[in-house]
Curated annotation (Swiss-Prot):
Belongs to the intron maturase 2 family. MatK subfamily. Usually encoded in the trnK tRNA gene intron. Probably assists in splicing its own and other chloroplast group II introns. GO terms for molecular function: RNA binding. Keywords: Chloroplast, mRNA processing, Plastid, RNA-binding, tRNA processing. It comes from the Eukaryota. This is Maturase K. InterPro entries: Domain_X (IPR024937), Maturase_MatK (IPR002866), Maturase_MatK_N (IPR024942). Pfam families: Intron_maturas2, MatK_N.
Length: 505
């Protein structure tokens, strides 16, 4: 237990005891605004002001004065009440305070991860989502099995609070955290509904991301600790290892089960394989290994019991699916990924005899998933369920260039993200749908036909839907009538956000 605490950096001297008074500092709300996800904390809603949104520190001053005059909890009571409170509704002030509070509780985490953040700043390319795919291409082609893991949502509210207690020792801040959680509709249930999480994340994006990341950090840190202990397994008994890693005493029941069932073999099987790899994006993770199917089943058993006994979370075993990489493709993230066997024939000769050798090379393949992308286009009303392009309604004062730029920007974003796929025919189909939908939208606006629009704006439409790479290729080989179906994939190290239509995993 002491070693686990040391690994996680749980030191009382690093805990923050005086965070609550920071809620009364104007600079905290300014920082929350500058570094916020949507930059909305200091902007008054239109329904409150009646004129355009403008950044205003006057709102913050009013809030702080009211917080000094009254109890903070009185301000937050009935946060959804639309009655006016100092000229604004209570939910607006509640959101401001929650965003400011999220900025405050990030302080201990920032101090703890200072060294890691410095390393990340030096390796700017590692921030790109595409940086994970070269790793998958290099490692996964030699592995046998993969587990698709849907990380359960944090459930019991007190578990979130207890997790943050390892970083924050300020009692008023923890009470305020409980107040935020228990005061939100549908957050007082044992198992948090996905709909409630989606609603909460939209209303308080920064606050939600901090809570979720702290939960995932706790889960992954213990797994990393266990994996690092594997180098000592050959010098100690599995029983002693189980005694040392009892997960803060919360997994005593799990350890009893492990001692009774797999005392001799489980932990050795879990960690003796050096080819176990783990990757995560948002709420989905994959774990792949060169080991047997039995090894992956034991990992699945371990994870399910860990979630149940450490986070008091009843996780269905169906959230972890084990498949062979050789005949299974998995979504991660925005790609359909799997192992493809490239057959090849080698001609050999010994003295006067020649012979042919059939062989195959494993390659990690990334495919653009057509069905989820079509579903995203249907949801955005670019086409029907059969993939047939349809027109979109536009404002009467929208110019042709604005409409074309809008469609072209979506097309370029999708092409940019899916540039790593070696098979582009699915992507070309999506681009065709967007281009024809754009033409139909223009025809609807001008009350004309698609053929007339294509004749009038044909070259302009074509150029807008070309990527930079395709423009260069068109200049080099202008006679090429259609793009090749197979080409080398390109990974861009400047992508830090997935377009909504690409994030269908």
């Amino acid at each position: 237990m002491e070693e686990l605490q040391g690994y996680l950096g749980i030191d009382r001297s690093c805990q923050q005891r005086f965070l609550y008074p920071l809620l009364f500092q104007e600079s905290i709300y300014a920082l929350a605004h500058d570094y916020g996800l949507n930059g909305s904390i200091l902007y008054e809603p239109i329904e409150n002001l009646g004129y355009d949104n403008k950044p205003s520190l006057l709102i913050v001053k009013r809030l702080i004065i009211r917080m000094h005059q009254q109890n903070l909890f009185f301000i937050l009571v009935n946060g959804s009440n639309q009655n006016r409170f100092v000229g604004h509704n209570r939910s607006f002030y509640s959101q401001m305070i929650s965003e400011g509070f999220a900025g405050i509780v990030e302080i201990p985490l920032s101090m703890r991860l200072a060294s890691s953040l410095e390393q990340i700043a030096k390796s700017h390319n590692l921030r790109s989502i595409h940086s994970i795919f070269p790793f998958l291409e290099d490692k996964f082609s030699h592995l046998n099995h993969v587990s698709d893991i849907l990380i359960p949502h944090p459930v019991h509210l007190e578990i979130l609070v207890q997790t943050l207690r390892r970083w924050i020792q300020d009692a008023p801040s923890l009470h305020l955290l409980r107040f935020f959680l228990h005061g939100h509709p549908n957050w007082n249930s044992l198992i948090t509904p996905k709909k409630s999480i989606s609603l909460f994340s939209k209303e308080n994006p920064r606050f939600f991301l901090f809570l979720y990341n702290s939960y995932v950090y706790e889960y992954e840190s213990i797994l990393v600790f266990l994996h690092k202990q594997s180098s000592h397994l050959r010098s100690i008994s599995s029983g002693a290892f189980l005694e040392r890693t009892n997960f803060y005493g919360k997994t005593e029941h799990l350890l009893v089960v492990l001692r009774n069932d797999f005392q001799k073999t489980l932990w050795l099987w879990l960690f003796k394989d050096p080819f176990m790899h783990y990757a995560r994006y948002q709420g989905k993770a994959i774990m792949a290994s060169k080991g047997t199917h039995l090894l992956m089943k034991k990992w699945k058993y371990h994870l399910v019991n860990f979630w149940q006994l450490h986070f008091y979370l009843w996780s269905q075993s169906g959230r972890i699916r084990i498949n062979e990489l050789s005949n299974h493709f998995f979504y991660f993230p925005g790609y359909l990924s799997g192992i493809r066997l490239n057959p090849s024939v080698v001609r050999g000769q010994m003295i006067e005899n020649s012979f042919m050798i059939d062989t195959g090379i494993k390659k990690f393949d990334m495919i653009v998933p057509i069905i989820p992308l079509i579903g995203s286009l249907v949801k955005a009303k670019f086409c029907n369920i059969s993939g047939y392009p349809i027109s979109k309604s536009v404002r009467a004062d929208s110019s042709n260039s604005d409409i074309i730029n809008r469609f072209g920007r979506i097309c370029r974003n999708l092409s940019h993200y899916h540039s790593g796929s070696s098979k582009k025919h699915n992507l070309y189909r999506i681009k065709y749908i967007l281009r024809l939908s754009c033409a139909k939208t223009l025809a609807r606006k001008h009350k004309s036909t698609v053929r007339t629009i294509l004749k009038r704006l044909g070259s302009e439409l074509l150029e807008e839907f070309l990527t930079e790479k395709e423009e260069i290729l068109s200049l080099i080989s202008p006679r090429t009538s259609s793009p090749p179906h197979r080409e080398e994939g390109i990974w861009y190290l400047d992508i830090i956000h997935i377009h909504g239509m690409s994030n269908h995993s």
